[in-house]
Structure formats: structure tokens, C-alpha cells
Amino acid sequence: MTDHLERDVSDVAHKWVPDARLGVCDVAVRPGALAGCTTSRDALAALRRIAAAAGLAADVRLLPDSSVGDEHSAAVTAAVAPLVREPRVSADHVSEALHGEILAVLERRDDAWLRVRAADGYHAWIHSGYVALGTAAWADDWAGRATLRSLGAELRCEGARFRLALGARAAPLPSGQVETADGRWWDIAAGAVRPEAELRVEARLVAAPEWALRWFSGAPYLWGGRTAWGVDCSGLVQATYAARGVALPRDSDLQSTTGQEVPLSATGGGYEAGDVLCFTDGHRISHVALWSGAGRIVHSALSRGGVTSDDLLADTPTAKRLRDFLVAVRRVERSRQ
């Protein structure tokens, strides 16, 4: 009986929440009940039908749930905040949230951990120490005012220092200072901030891989990273296109389904600068890179220690392996030609 119910619950999850990164269906068979939570109303209805047919209680919560109260939103107050797979410090680091970004709060656990949804749709956990909580109206107010984006800005206030990662958000003040998400006012001591619209124009003046190298060259590889302090392959691609006003999913396999398909070419014929090259590990898309032209790619690779430019057509074991595992090329931005 239990095995049958577990299969039914698994089938519901696969149907209504096929990707656990983009939704939640965390339900288990307990003595006398189905228990857990989900973000899908359709999954909730199906689980209730399964429980009723089996004579079980349906203790399944729809997220966001009552643990959130009125605080449905979180603004990141740390310079960068890790998003993790489970609500514990040692859990896998799956992504990051930058200062000033707004997260949707889905569940609160033990007053320490929050299950959240990021703007790119990613679902994960974050420790409450990294954020400030508030209502949806509070978050909308901050988002409307936080029109500045960091270009490696270093802020100072009465001896305190605060570094903002590339792309982090701040609000302009009439005094020329900036306000951060925790309400503090700062002077800009180094680096710069730009209005988002201005940054978008500046980013589009150069090809995407050139912009990526300008701001990320030499950044160390970090699984789940999104900043020049540490970035993975899909984080680099996502950040590069975010600066251009193009929203991409977080992970490489998700990025491989966006945009327009470009026919594969052994020499790169037909590729344009900024096309996203997608590589497999033999099972799934596991790496992405930006085509730079003349056979070169820009990517963040563990084998290279971080962000660099490589010759994809070179006669080296690494380049040959990449060519052998190239399975798709996607154009995520309208061609300039």
C-alpha cells in the first residue's frame, strides 16, 4: 500500500512540478496522512484526491503558507547571499542572491531559514540573516527606488565599508549618496553605480563575450556563483545577458532551451558573438560558453580555474573534448546583422 501511494505521489510531482528547481512538491507518505507542501494548486488537488481514495488525511500545505505571515518578500541586505538546496548551513550551494534583489518568501522554518523563489524562478533556501523581510508593498517600493546597479562599487559611511558585487542594487539619493536595502546611506568611495537603463545601453555597445571578459576575467570558478568573486558557467552567461536586459534561466540545461537554435558547425560558421554554446557531460547539458568569434569562447570552467577565453578549435585535448561534447548552440539575443 505504501509503495503504491509513494508511486502515486511521485507521479503527481513529475506531472505538475517536473523540475524541483522551479517549483516545490515535497510530500511524503506518513502514518495516516500525506504530509508536506507544494507550490502547485494542481498538485495539491491531485494529492487530496489520492489521500481521500486511500482514506488518509491530506496534510499538504500550499506555498506560500501561513508561516510567512504578511512578510511575503525578502530583500537581500548582505553583499551576496548563498542559496542552498536544504535548510542547513552545510547544504549544497546552488545559486546566489545579490544585494538589493527581491526574493519571494514561500515558507519560514524555525525563524532561521526561508524557502524562497528568486526572480529567475529558482527555488531554494536562504538563511534569514542575509535578508530583511517585509510586505509585498514594501518590496515594490524598494524595487521601484533601487534603480542603480553596481559596477564594483565600494561604499563608505562613517568608517564602515561595504562592497557591492557587479549588478547589485541600490537606490539613488538627492545628496548624491546611495541607499542600500538595509536603509543605510553611503558615499561612493570607489567603483561606480549606474542607472539600470544606462548600464543596459553601455553593455550593448560591445559584444556579450567582450563585456563578460571586461568584468569577469580572472574570476574564480565557484559552483552556484554569480559574481566576479566567484562564478560558474551558467552564472557568467546569465549575468552577461542580464546586463543587456535579457533574462535567462539560472542553469546551463535550462539556458540550452532558450532563444533560437543555431545549426552546429565544425568551424563555427554561422555563429555570432554572444551565441551560447552548450556542452554535455554525456547525460545532460552541464556547461555553457559564449562564442567570441574566430574560434574562441569565453567561459567559466573549473578546469581553467575560472573565467577565461579559450580557442575552441585548438589542437589540444581540452579543446577536442569540448568540441566532441558540443551539442547545441542557442542565439538568445536578436541578431545585429
Question: Which residues are covered by each model-predicted region?
Answer:
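Aromatic- and glycine-rich peptidoglycan recognition patches
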Residues: 133, 195-199, 264-267, 292-337
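Short alpha-helix capping/helix-loop boundary micro-motifs
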Residues: 86-92, 152-160, 257-267
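...with weaker cross-activation on analogous glycine-rich loops/strands in unrelated enzymes
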Residues: 247-306, 312
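Short, well-ordered loop/turn sites that connect or cap secondary structure elements
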Residues: 91, 97, 164, 270-271
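Short glycine/threonine-rich beta-strand-turn micro-motifs
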Residues: 22-47, 113
